[in-house]
Amino acid sequence: MSDYKVNEATIAKKAELVDVYAQKMTEAASIVVADSRGLSVDEDTQLRKQLREAGVEFKVVKNSILRRAAEKAGLEGLSEAFSGPSAVAFSNEDVVAPAKVLADFAKDAENLEIKAGVIEGKVSSKEEIQAIASLPSRDGLLSMLLSVLQAPIRNVALAVKAVAEKEESAA
């Protein structure tokens, strides 16, 4: 028998963290796993600020806890992303926000690397996350949709106005 004794309080704390992160993974609209090793303190502070402003939660968590949480959340295939230092960005509302902020930041900070992610419960590769990052934000997409919906109404209104003006000038 070894002299090493496992601290039960530590095990309970880790189990609680696994539960917390499994729940976050289950509830999140999107998750992005990144390696932020090598970022300066200033860069890290800037990144966290941008993520917070976008409504994204950003945490650096031990890989063993993230692996267990991913298993518990039923996210098969995400565990491979948890090697080396891992930071995780969670968004419960905007699917695009974590990918967009991290990808935009990675353009200027070569030490930030996107590893993988989860979009609406589906494990996604680095390439898929970067493709999603190129999409407009939720607000941008809603704005585009509104423009598309308004165009036919605007055209009908202009046609009615033109007919009314034509009839006025004929009278």
UniProtKB/Swiss-Prot annotation:
Signal peptide interval: none
Entry keyword rRNA-binding: yes
UniProt xrefs under PROSITE patterns: RIBOSOMAL_L10
Matching Pfam families: Ribosomal_L10
TM segment ranges: none
Gene Ontology cellular component annotations, sorted alphabetically: large ribosomal subunit
GO molecular function, one term: structural constituent of ribosome
Keyword check for RNA-binding: yes
UniProt keywords, alphabetically: Ribonucleoprotein, Ribosomal protein, RNA-binding, rRNA-binding
SUPFAM superfamilies for this protein: Ribosomal protein L10-like
GO biological process, one term: translation
Gene3D superfamilies: 3.30.70.1730
SUBUNIT field: Part of the ribosomal stalk of the 50S ribosomal subunit. The N-terminus interacts with L11 and the large rRNA to form the base of the stalk. The C-terminus forms an elongated spine to which L12 dimers bind in a sequential fashion forming a multimeric L10(L12)X complex.
Family note: Belongs to the universal ribosomal protein uL10 family.
Function, as annotated: Forms part of the ribosomal stalk, playing a central role in the interaction of the ribosome with GTP-bound translation factors.
Protein's UniProt name: Large ribosomal subunit protein uL10
Species assigned in the record: Lactococcus lactis subsp. cremoris (strain MG1363)
Lineage: Bacteria, Bacillati, Bacillota, Bacilli, Lactobacillales
Gene: rplJ
